[in-house]
A protein has these predicted regions:
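Trp/Gly-enriched beta-strand surface patches
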Residues: 326-368
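Carbohydrate-binding surface patches
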Residues: 277-338, 385
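Terminal accessory regions of large proteins
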Residues: 387, 412-504
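C-terminal beta-strand-rich structural cap/linker in extracellular carbohydrate-active enzymes
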Residues: 297, 367-399
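Cytochrome P450 core scaffold surrounding the K-helix E-X-X-R motif
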Residues: 228, 307-314, 391-394
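Alpha-amylase-like alpha-glycosidases and glucanotransferases acting on alpha-linked glucans and related
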Residues: 1-259, 265, 341, 361, ...
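Flexible, glycine/threonine-enriched loop-and-boundary segments that flank and lead into catalytic domains
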Residues: 160-166, 266-293, 353-369
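Active-site-adjacent segment of 2-oxoglutarate/Fe(II) JmjC oxygenases
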Residues: 251-253, 331-341, 401-434
Length: 504
């Protein structure tokens, strides 16, 4: 508590500091008695007054005013002891508490602000796994999603995957209201929690590609190590930005922020299980897709220090409202459908991996029937973008897909050209080989018999004609192949004559 003295009347009171029951009280705060309706009304009016001046309002430690926690802290049930020892003598039954505090305070605030200043965005800091409650029940516009930071940091991957699934089954729109972050002024810096290597960037990539609002902490991009509290007026450490860290943000993260329109909505968001070759779900892999404005994206992140590989195919259950808003149906889709790809064996999909800028090709029918196969290193991620479909009219794309066998290339167009030139390359290798050059240019091979020489010349003749045939097929041009072959044979004979003269 702190001592308050009225300098005019001399009246003295001892007032509690704010407290969440987990550590020392907040000595820059005074705790109000929210059991009094006039207090709740006064605070609500103050919020509305602020809303007339600012479009966004953030409520610090908002969860401490939720009914169940306010009761736990300040008016505990008889026999429970309470989290603030001196409040035990102020215990109160549930009935008494509900009579004095009948409606959730934040529900009243949201409703009254909506009526008075409807364009105001209300953002709540709510921990203790109350994020969903603040959005679903209290109607808060945005809520800090501390579960993202804590669970990804601790690699509680199965729990966080289930958290996302639960939201999708209840109401997918809630995902849009989460503020995802990797640190805040009350926590250690992002780099103390996630490092500065692959785990940090994998988590950061998730943060900026999930629906909701990504939030960067002060100094996060620069790699500052000093923890900044809300009370800090200046930095106390002499730190400089980490240039390599900044460059990697510019290369991997910032381009994704320019595509928030692709990631922020939930109507086309789908979440997947990552199925390993032995048929098990790898709970350490976060896999999801989204699409908007004709663009599509697939994101995968392996939040574990181990390699993995597997398939993504069927999405998790997702609530879909019907024409009757009171009813919802649970739906799922396979990845080809989620990306709105043609289910046709004659179509192929080409896409680019943002992490390495390589391009890949997959058959549409295979994507629909089998899903997408992906390999991931420890703490590695893939973000597949720039999807486009092509029709395979003359089997050139099927040949390319078979040739690449899942591998990525810098440019599909160049790889396609290289694939089309494969017959020409193979024919040329049969001509320009080691045996020919040894025969023509190494003196020890001048002792070949006449029959041996004739066989080599005939082989060159045959292979050269095949080579010219392939060139003609590729260019669709006719030429005097017989003349070219005769010219080559003439050159070979000339070379042989020169060799014989040298020998002589």
């Amino acid at each position: 508590v702190f001592k308050r003295v009225d300098s005019y009347t001399g009246d003295t009171k001892y007032i509690y500091h704010g407290n969440d029951g987990t550590s020392m009280p907040w000595n820059d705060t005074a705790q109000r008695n929210y059991l009094k309706s006039e207090v709740r009304e006064a605070v609500t009016n103050t919020i509305i007054h602020v809303a007339k001046k600012f479009d966004v309002i953030r409520f610090d430690a908002a969860m401490t005013l939720a009914k169940k926690h306010y009761q736990r802290l300040w008016f505990p049930k008889p026999g429970t002891g309470g989290d603030i020892p001196s409040r035990t003598e102020h215990s109160m039954s549930q009935e008494e508490f509900d009579e004095l505090f009948p409606v959730e305070f934040w529900r009243e605030v949201v409703d009254k602000v909506k009526e008075a200043e409807p364009n105001t965005l209300l953002l709540a800091e709510a921990f203790w796994m109350m994020e969903g409650y603040f959005v679903r029940t209290l109607g808060m516009h945005r809520v800090y999603n501390s579960a993202f930071m804590n669970m990804i940091k601790n690699e509680d991957n199965a729990k966080y995957r289930q958290t996302i699934k639960n939201v999708l089954e209840f109401n997918p729109q809630i995902l849009k209201r989460y503020v995802n972050f990797m640190n805040n002024p009350d926590e250690e810096t992002a780099h103390a929690q996630f490092g500065e290597d692959d785990k940090y960037f994998g988590t950061c990539a998730m943060m900026v590609t999930l629906p909701g609002l990504p939030m960067f902490g002060h100094g996060q991009v620069e790699g500052y190590k000093e923890k900044y509290g809300m009370e800090y007026k200046k930095a106390y450490w002499d730190e400089n930005p980490n240039p390599e860290l900044v460059k990697r943000h510019e290369r991997e993260i910032f381009p994704l922020l320019h595509k928030r329109y692709l990631f922020s909505e939930v109507d086309n968001f789908q979440f997947y299980d990552f199925i390993t070759p032995d048929g098990h779900v790898d709970e350490n892999v976060f896999a999801y897709s989204n699409r908007a404005r004709g663009e599509k994206a697939i994101i995968l992140y392996n939040n574990k220090f181990q390699e993995t590989s597997g398939w993504i195919k069927n999405s998790a259950l997702k609530a879909n409202k019907t024409a009757n808003d009171d009813h919802k149906e649970m739906v799922t889709s396979e990845i080809g459908e989620a990306l709105d790809l043609k289910n046709d064996n004659n179509y192929f999909t080409i896409f680019r991996d943002h992490t390495n800028n390589l391009q890949y090709i997959r058959n549409n029918k295979q994507l629909h029937d089998q899903g997408m196969y992906v390999s991931l290193g420890a703490f590695k991620y893939h973000i597949f973008l720039d999807f486009r479909e092509v029709e395979d009219r003359d089997n050139i794309y099927s040949e390319l897909a078979a040739f690449l066998d899942g591998r990525g290339v810098p440019d599909i167009k160049e790889a396609l050209q290289e694939t089309r030139l494969q017959p020409v390359h193979q024919a040329s290798r049969k001509i320009f080989n080691t045996e020919l050059f040894n025969y023509l240019f190494k003196k020890k091979n001048l002792e070949y018999s006449a029959d041996k020489k004739e066989k080599i010349i005939n082989r060159i003749d045959t292979n050269y004609q095949k080579f010219l045939n392939e060139i003609q097929d590729f260019t669709s041009r006719n030429g005097n192949r017989k003349k070219v072959v005769n010219d080559v044979k003439s050159l070979l004979n000339s070379q042989l004559n020169i060799n014989q003269l040298k020998k002589g």
